[in-house]
Amino acid sequence: MRGYDGAPPRRAKYLRDALHGSIVVEPHEIPFVDAPLFQRLRGILQTGPVYLTYPSARHSRFEHALGVLHLAGRMVARLADLAHPSLPAEHRRAVRLAGLLHDIGHGVFSHSSEKVMVATPLLAAQLDPALPGHQPHEKVGALLLRSAPLRRLFEQADVDADAVVALITGDHAGVRAHGLPPYLAGVISGPIDADKLDYFARDSLFSGVPAILDYDRLLQSLAIGEPGIQLSMAGAGELEKLLFNRITMYHALYNHHKVQTADCMIQGAVEAIVGPAFGAAPASDGLLAVVADSPEGSAQTLDFRRVIDFLRLSDEALLHAPSGDPYVSDVLQRLRTRRLLQRAFVLQRDTVAAIDDDTYLDFAEAVRRSADLVRQRIFERLRESVPTLHPGDVWVRPSVVPRVSDTDVIATTPGDATRHPTIFSGWNPDLADRRVTNPVQRNYLLYKAPIYVFAPPDHLAVAERAATSVLREQFDCLLPRVTFVPRPRG
C-alpha cells in the first residue's frame, strides 16, 4: 500500500447510503476504508454480470461492505444490551471491523473467477490451507488480513486480526480462543448474519426485484443462545419471510438464464488464460491490463498464475483488457456488447418423460455432480459437426440451490435450548447426502432449479441434439423427442 500512511482522523465520518441512510464510520475504521486493498472493492460488482439483465444492479462490494459494517454495529449493540456482563468496547470494534472487511478477498468478477481458482491446482495451492471448506475469497481475505500493512492498522485500532478472521469465517472455537463470546461469530457468519441481511436487501433494491425486510423487527428479536444467535418467537414470521424471499431471489435474479450464461462466458475467458477446459493450452499471449497501483504506473501482463493477479483488476478493466488470444478477445467483446450464449437445452421436471419425481431428483442430482464431464462430452459430440467450436462456447450450468440451513433458531425464551422449526426445517444443503425431505426444497428442485446447456446462437439445434444424446447415453434416461429450444433472442 505504497504512499498510504493509515493515520486515523480524530472524528467519525457519516456516509449516506441508499439502503440504510446514514452510516457512521468510526475514526479507527476510516484507515481501513481508505486502504487501497479496500478501495479497490469499488470496482468489483456485488452481483457480477447481473447488470446485463437487470441494468440498475451495478452496486459494488464496497457499498455492501459498508452496509455490513452498519448492520453488524446494530446487531452487536443489541446483543450488548442482552449480554451479562456487557460486551467490552474492543469486542464491538472487532465485530464491526469483521463486517467491514468480510469481502476484502474478492477478486475480479468475484464468484465467476473463483470457480477457475478452485479448479486450478496451481492457484488452489496458494490459498490458506488452514480454512478447509471455505470459499476462495475467504481464504484470500484471511491472508490479506494477516498481511503486514493491515496488521499495522489492526494494532493501531487495538483489535486482534486473528479474532477478526475467526469472526468472518464463523469459527466459534477460534472466536472463543481469542477471548470473545462465541455467539459473536453469528453476527458475520450465521443463519441471520449482517452479510445476508445487507446483500439480500441491497440486491433487491438495485435490481428492482421487490422484497421487503423489516430490519427493526429482526434486530429487536435477537437473543443470545449457545453457541450462536437466536431469535425470539416475535421474529419467527420475519425470518420465514426473509428465507422465502431469498429463495425467490435466487430463481428470479441469480439463476436467471442470461445471468448464468454471462457468468459462464466470464469464467470461460479466465479459464482460457489460466488453462482451458479439456486440457487445451493456455492463451499464449496472456491478458494485458492496466494496473492502477503498478510501481511504474505502466501496463502489466497478467496471466492469472498467481492469486494476487485476481485482485489487480476491476470488473470493467477485465472486460476492456486487450488480449492477443483470439478467443479471449472475442468473448470479452461479446460480453461488452451483450451478445451472449443462449439456451440450447433446459433440463427440468417437464422435459423428462416416464419417471416419477423421486427418480427425476436422483437423475438431476447425478447430472449436477457430473456437470463438467457432461459438458466435455457434449462439446466433443458438438465438435463433430462444428469443428471450429471452442471449449468456452459450451456449458452445462446447474441452477444454484440456495443454502437455507441452520434456520431452527427460534426460542420461546432467550437461551431456551428447545428450538422451534421454521417451514424450512430440514432443508438439506448437501443434495448428494440424502433424499430431499423438506417440501419447499423439493418443489424448488422440481420446478425452479433447471439445468441449462448453453451454446452459440448459430448452433442451438445441433447442441440440443448433442445434449439429449449424451444424457441418454450417460444416464440411460428417456427424454421426450421435443424439448425446449428457445428461439434466438438478446
Annotate the PLM regions.
Residues 1-97, 106-490:
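Histidine-centered, transition-metal-coordinating active-site segments
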